[in-house]
UniProtKB/Swiss-Prot annotation:
Residue span of region G4: 136-139
Species of provenance: Acinetobacter baumannii (strain ATCC 17978 / DSM 105126 / CIP 53.77 / LMG 1025 / NCDC KC755 / 5377)
Protein name per UniProt: Elongation factor Tu
Gene: tuf1
InterPro entries reported for this sequence: EF-Tu_GTP-bd, EF-Tu_GTPase, EFTu-like_2, EFTU_2, G_TR_CS, P-loop_NTPase, Small_GTP-bd, T_Tr_GTP-bd_dom
Annotated spans, G2: 60-64
Superkingdom: Bacteria
Region feature (G5): 174-176
GO cellular component: cytosol
Binding site for Mg(2+): T26
Region described as G1: 19-26
Length: 396
């Protein structure tokens, strides 16, 4: 059978494996890549290639991550797998590898364990929208009732963190049996069933260009006779000459009209997601706009000063603080293009936060910033990064 030619026109979806240590995340990753390559074309990767995860830097934080790609009949998947629990925490909080959906691997021999719970909570906090469960090592459990029990426990755990536990697909199998090419329901069939569940349960993600227009402002210039130009990289959507935009954040929201879009000194009709543009604003004075604000489609994003966040605090080795911080700590929060001072409130019963910890906190900023849940930020002290976080919930 001739291998299908790789086509770039399949929709691209980002996924990853999560779950407790030694429950089989990396073995499953290898099994999916191998079986998809064999069945649908593409390149197989073996366990050792995935397990020797290379180091990467995201926002100055060292993270070990493996990236694997595979095809299903209708999609192209990019899959991340991390070797250690700390890598998952950092990866999910920094958004180094954004996931459109996660595969929760839970060993049927153990049932849900502490990191199973923690990864589900992290997924909820950082906004992973969908979870699919792979109940692994089912070939080592003789008792059907025990499998039912473990499946029920996992579903209840998902429901605890506001995932639809009752409707979540749960695939039973054995990653090792599948990787070894064994037939039967727990072998290769289980991995093909998992891929089919990815295809049907995770909706195709909305592309940046189809979202509402948003551009973080990096710089502001005054051009005599023409007005004020703001520059930045368009994060989402499309902006056309003549459209209205809002300037959001730091000060009161102002509405204005785009009178020109330029790129590399050339005038354009529109600016699109991913492009660096200069945008000319009608009747806006140079001092009314500043770095750290955003240009947005009117009504799509609001400025906020209070939010709950999930934060990873850099360890000493990563260049972070050497000492813990306490309630009321006031660092700078770096959103998109600027620093804003904020005060933190730790959860009840949490006295202090040690370097290397991840923690939930509430933050109150001294200026409002345009934000939605899922927005990433860095925590800085005098220009050096000491933490990374993600907005879990906006509160005021």
């Amino acid at each position: 059978m001739a291998k299908a030619k790789f086509e770039r026109n399949k929709p691209h979806v980002n996924v990853g494996t999560i779950g407790h240590v030694d429950h089989g995340k990396t073995t499953l990753t290898a099994a999916i890549a191998t079986i998809c390559a064999k069945t649908y074309g593409g390149e197989a990767k073996d366990y050792s290639q995935i397990d020797s995860a290379p180091e990467e830097k995201a926002r100055g934080i060292t993270i070990n991550t493996s990236h694997v790609e595979y095809d299903s009949p209708t999609r192209h998947y990019a899959h991340v797998d991390c070797p250690g629990h700390a890598d998952y925490v950092k990866n999910m909080i920094t958004g180094a590898a954004q996931m459109d959906g996660a595969i929760l691997v839970c060993a049927a021999t153990d049932g849900p364990m502490p990191q199973t719970r923690e990864h589900i909570l992290l997924s909820r906090q950082v906004g992973v929208p969908y979870i699919i469960v792979f109940l692994n090592k089912c070939d080592l459990v003789d008792d059907e009732e025990l499998l039912e029990l473990v499946e029920m426990e996992v579903r209840e755990l998902l429901s605890t963190y506001d995932f639809p536990g009752d409707d979540t697909p749960v695939i039973r199998g054995s990653a090792l049996a599948a990787l070894n090419g064994e037939a039967g329901p727990y072998g290769e069939e289980s991995v093909l069933a998992l891929v089919a569940a990815l295809d049907s349960y995770i909706p195709e993600p909305e592309r940046a260009i189809d979202k509402a227009f948003l551009m973080p402002i990096e710089d502001v210039f005054s051009i005599s006779g023409r007005g004020t130009v703001v520059t930045g990289r368009v994060e989402a959507g499309i902006i056309k000459v003549g459209e209205e935009v809002e300037i959001v954040g730091i000060k009161d929201t102002v509405k204005t009209t785009v009178t020109g879009v330029e790129m590399f000194r050339k005038l354009l009709d529109e600016g699109r997601a991913g492009e660096n543009c200069g945008i000319l604003l009608r009747g806006t004075k140079r001092e009314e706009v500043q770095r750290g604000q955003v240009l947005a489609k009117p009504g799509t994003i609001k400025p906020h000063t209070k939010f709950d966040a999930e934060v990873y605090v850099l360890s000493k080795e990563e260049g972070g603080r050497h000492t813990p911080f306490l309630n009321g700590y006031r660092p700078q929060f770096y959103f998109r293009t600027t620093d804003v001072t904020g005060a933190i409130q730790l959860k009840e019963g949490v006295e202090m936060v040690m370097p290397g910890d991840n923690v939930e906190m509430s933050v109150e900023l001294i200026h409002p910033i345009a934000m939605d849940p899922g927005l990433r930020f860095a925590i800085r002290e005098g220009g050096r990064t000491v933490g990374a976080g993600v907005v879990a919930k906006v509160t005021a």
